[in-house]
Amino acid sequence: MIGKRFFQTTSKKIAFAFDIDGVLFRGKKPIAGASDALKLLNRNKIPYILLTNGGGFSERARTEFISSKLDVDVSPLQIIQSHTPYKSLVNKYSRILAVGTPSVRGVAEGYGFQDVVHQTDIVRYNRDIAPFSGLSDEQVMEYSRDIPDLTTKKFDAVLVFNDPHDWAADIQIISDAINSENGMLNTLRNEKSGKPSIPIYFSNQDLLWANPYKLNRFGQGAFRLLVRRLYLELNGEPLQDYTLGKPTKLTYDFAHHVLIDWEKRLSGKIGQSVKQKLPLLGTKPSTSPFHAVFMVGDNPASDIIGAQNYGWNSCLVKTGVYNEGDDLKECKPTLIVNDVFDAVTKTLEKYA
């Protein structure tokens, strides 16, 4: 199978989208068959992208790590992390509060945001703002910057990039921002409303994710639930927020654009050096060259439901969140397979 060649006709062209955690990797360790699966697709010039609700690093750093570990060439133009669609917001907001691990400041600046404040900058400014922060003074000084106009320039939006590590402080700081007077630090608006003072975006809503521990762990979806619950208590109305990542249509539309762009590069229709054109958030491709796209994932609630709702096929693997016998409820994967290599080979045998 590894050496077999597959030929696609113009009218029967297929493509793949792969989750990363629980499909290609478990933690930082590659899952058996992941390398062979991608090599098989590369050899046959079958287009694929990586579509993950993970994040915290630049697309280049993430694909360099994946390429190194799997011994396969993966381009930064092939990956959509949970926060990759934030690139489309660069011209919309001036100052943003970038919430997540310390690395997300660099990610946001790499996207082109001109004025990025990290939540640790606010802890540094006044530790009484976050009395239950778990960060030491040394950590705060390492992660943060001194922002001279922190109290005189308003925030335009809150963008949660990945799962933050200091939830007590981060929830407090986010709550302050979305209940402030027009995005100004140290203020509290008079009215109560479901609409936050400034827009807030969460890059995914995964309640659980799979790491090397045998039981699934809470993810950004759990963090979002806490923010939303506290907002409801303070305002008496549900928070009107924006959520990206799988299974949202916003992210699948964005991913579809990226997949079409990669197919054009792979087939020589555009050069590899041509800058990737970013779609506007919420815009569906007008046409698609694919007869079918297969989403390979381990999480029924994000990968499979997202693909199903979007009109893509799906392959559910047993190497991550999903365990055989779990109640799939409304999920209807096209295939349930052991692992990613199984997903690719069975799909190609049946559809290519």
Curated annotation (Swiss-Prot):
GO terms for cellular component: mitochondrion. One of its GO terms (biological process) is glycerophospholipid biosynthetic process. GO terms for molecular function: hydrolase activity. Pfam families: Hydrolase_6, Hydrolase_like. InterPro entries: CDP-alcohol_PTase-I (IPR050324), HAD-like_sf (IPR036412), HAD-SF_hydro_IIA (IPR006357), HAD-SF_hydro_IIA_CECR5 (IPR006353), HAD_sf (IPR023214). Coiled coil: none annotated. It is found in: Mitochondrion. Present with 3870 molecules/cell in log phase SD medium. Belongs to the HAD-like hydrolase superfamily. This is Mitochondrial hydrolase YKR070W.
